[in-house]
Design a protein with these regions (language model features):
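Conserved small/polar residues in nucleotide/adenosyl-binding loops
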Residues: 1-5
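Hydrophobic alpha-helical segments, especially N-terminal targeting/anchoring helices
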Residues: 26, 66, 102, 178, ...
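Core beta-strand elements of the Rossmann-like FAD/NAD(P) dinucleotide-binding domain
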Residues: 28-39, 192-193
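AMP-binding/adenylate-forming core of the ANL superfamily
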Residues: 40-42, 196-197
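Glycine-rich, N-terminal phosphate-binding loop of Rossmann-like dinucleotide-binding domains
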Residues: 44-45, 200
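A conserved FAD-binding loop/helix module that cradles the flavin
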Residues: 49-66, 193, 205-213
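An anion/pyrophosphate-binding glycine-rich loop and adjacent beta-alpha core
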Residues: 62, 68-169
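Structured mid-domain segments that build the active-site/substrate or prosthetic-cofactor binding neighborhood
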Residues: 166-213
Length: 213
């Protein structure tokens, strides 16, 4: 089932570890409604918005209050390319295509073969770190859409200017434990919450381990 944008989920309706519907509130008129459903897929993302703006884990809260355990909630993936004073995070592919990192003074931040966590730490320790994507060469055309978004949101033209960055959480690893079919698992792999499924960042299959692959 799919909930309309004008509705917020309140709680799962369930009996004996089997889902039968969901209660929602209409944010336009304030009316609370119960919707019947044979199956519900929670796919609203993780809880990375708890650190800035974005997903806040409403789906995870629904599952937890229904008695579904959450797994690996301590594992959080960070990105070194969050644009300061926005909720924008630049793709790491920019670094592979030739973008460079610097302090505002002009000093280079040499990341070489560093791991992503090491680059995040480097950015966190730097004084006013910036990313320079002005010299991407033939790859620049692939980033036009990203540059347009940044300019619309910040007024900065990345093809001509550097932009301030910061390390920040961008994805959560943990979530609703699921099996290979996406079913929400209870205390053992042989027991699942009938009719409840999870996908994407709301789920935790164990595939990533402690960080995003």
């Amino acid at each position: 089932m799919c909930i309309r944008d004008s509705h917020l989920p309140l709680s799962l309706i369930h009996t004996n570890e089997s889902v039968s519907g969901i209660t929602v509130v209409d944010i336009v008129n304030g009316r609370i409604t119960a919707l019947q459903a044979k199956a519900i897929i929670i796919a609203d993302g993780g809880f990375e918005g708890a650190f800035s703006h974005g997903q806040v884990g409403l789906g995870l809260d629904l599952a937890l209050r229904a008695g579904v355990p959450l797994r690996d909630m301590e594992f959080i993936a960070h990105s070194p390319l969050g644009i300061k004073d926005t909720n924008l995070i630049l793709p790491l592919g920019l670094l592979h295509d030739g973008a460079t990192l610097h302090e505002a003074s002009g000093s280079d931040l040499e990341f070489g073969e560093s791991t992503l966590d090491e680059v995040c730490q480097m950015v966190s320790n730097a004084k006013q770190p910036v990313i320079d994507a002005r010299n991407l060469g033939d790859a620049s055309g692939w980033w036009n859409a990203v540059f347009r978004t940044v300019k619309q949101r910040t007024g900065i033209d990345m093809s001509r200017q550097t932009v301030g960055i910061e390390s920040r959480p961008h994805a959560t690893i943990g979530g609703i434990t699921v099996d290979e079919h996406g079913r929400a698992i209870l205390s053992t792999w042989s027991r699942w919450f009938t009719g409840l499924y999870a996908a994407g960042d709301a789920s935790c299959s164990g595939f990533h381990g402690a960080d995003i692959l």
